[in-house]
Amino acid sequence: MLNLLLLSLSVCLLYVFITAFWNLYIHPLHHIPGPRQWIAFPILRHLSAIRGTLDSDLRRWHFRYGSAVRFGPDEASFITAEAWKDIYGSTRPQLPRVISSGSNTSDIINANDANHARYRKALAHAFSTNGVRDQEPLVIDYIVKLVGRLKEVAESKLPTDMVKWYKLTTFDMIGDLAFGEHFGGLEKSEYHHWVATVGRFTRIIPFLKIMDAYPVLFKVFLAVMPQSFWKAQAEQAEYTKLTVQKRLNSSIAQDRPDFMDSMLRHRNEKDKLSEHELESNASVLVLAGSETPADLLSGVTYWLLKTPEALEKATGEVRSLMKAESEITFSSVEARLPYLLACVNEGLRLYPSLPGELQRMSPDTPMKISGYDIPPRTRVSVHQYAAYSSPTNFHDPDRFIPERWLPEAKTNPSSPYLFDNREVFQPFSVGPRGCIGKSLAYPLMRTIIARVLWNFDFDLCEESRSWHIQKTFGLWEKPPLICKLTQRKQS
């Protein structure tokens, strides 16, 4: 018996050794540099993801190895503008998304190309120029509610968590646009159970990616998962189903300028969305359209407070050019507040809403990405956090410098930011699967920041001085951003 165990152990060790040797020295991807331990033993890459350090590790690997990094046997990450075009562009047939077997393929993020085109067509009106214009009054109503609640906080003179206020606002707002009713977060000053479940679920994302690579390990993980998590997931799904059904049966179903109205415009066509697809897409729109803007709003607020000169310029611009709060609208912010727009871009650069990679699978034939030969069936991606913080792409990359986005920085020969690689900055991705919500997200975020700065002076509390040091689990794991607010004294 002992001999059999020793033989089995020896065979396992030999297999591990041979596999590691193959991955390091023979594998067709061996010409791309990267951390040798991760390449030899891919479980280390997954452990990094489970710990929440994968994105900061990849940032470090790119700083060490350059514009292309191999971080697993068949995984490569890039940080060049060319890689965006090669991986996500529309000049060749789309590279398929890499998704885990547990992903919901009935939504616009994880769908195959054919269904993605259907979903995008169904949502096209919602994110068109006319659609965004029609949604603006509803968005402004929620921003007014946020400002009203923050005025109460300022009057109390107590510190407050801006991450929470931004999340309550964006989830109420996008929930209303997707489901036809809000979550009541701003009214109650607390997260609805649907929203709270999202926060708990993000930590599970790395485990889902283990499912296909290490199915036995994943079964162990499932066995130790608390039943309360699965109960919360079921309650979230049931809430989505009931709320969508309520919206479909409502008398305003065809007259309300929201996401569901857009999806229902094609209900009599042969490629209409099923009720399950309506539920899936409404749910993912709430998640993507709420969590990521809240990230950006929190990030911009933090970096402005950490950079007093930028805060002074942005606040001065808003208050000098906007004579009344009601003047702060989608169009006026874009047309009249160039420095604020630069602050939003710089916030997205230092704190991208999706810090990690959107992986694609290379085809069954070799291809080139950013000049590198890539063998078939390789998982490839641009890593946003690493790309935006690389000194090869941006001058002084670790500092919050909105001036780099102003027009003169791109044309003035004496500007230190003249050669910043702005084409690598693609926070909403590119190509046919680029984020459809960009047309709403940008004006929404800019208008919230502008109205908050118009109304309040901020101080960053000591406990949030290092707020930007965070773990990531697909999304940022945001700690509270504790600030003191003072209502602006108007002359």
Curated annotation (Swiss-Prot):
GO molecular function: heme binding; iron ion binding; monooxygenase activity; oxidoreductase activity, acting on paired donors, with incorporation or reduction of molecular oxygen
Keyword Lipid metabolism annotated: no
E.C. no: 1.-.-.-
Listed InterPro entries: Cyt_P450, Cyt_P450_CS, Cyt_P450_E_grp-I, Cyt_P450_sf, Cytochrome_P450_monoxygenase
Cofactor: heme
Pathway membership: Secondary metabolite biosynthesis; terpenoid biosynthesis
Bilayer disposition of the protein: Single-pass membrane protein
Cell compartment(s), UniProt: Membrane
Keyword terms, alphabetized: Heme, Iron, Membrane, Metal-binding, Monooxygenase, Oxidoreductase, Transmembrane, Transmembrane helix
Miscellaneous notes: The 15-deoxyoxalicine B cluster is a rare cluster that contains its own geranylgeranyl pyrophosphate synthase (olcC), in contrast to other related clusters which rely on a FPP/GGPP synthase localized outside of the cluster.
Name of the protein: Cytochrome P450 monooxygenase olcB
Organism name: Penicillium canescens
Lineage: Eukaryota, Fungi, Dikarya, Ascomycota, Pezizomycotina
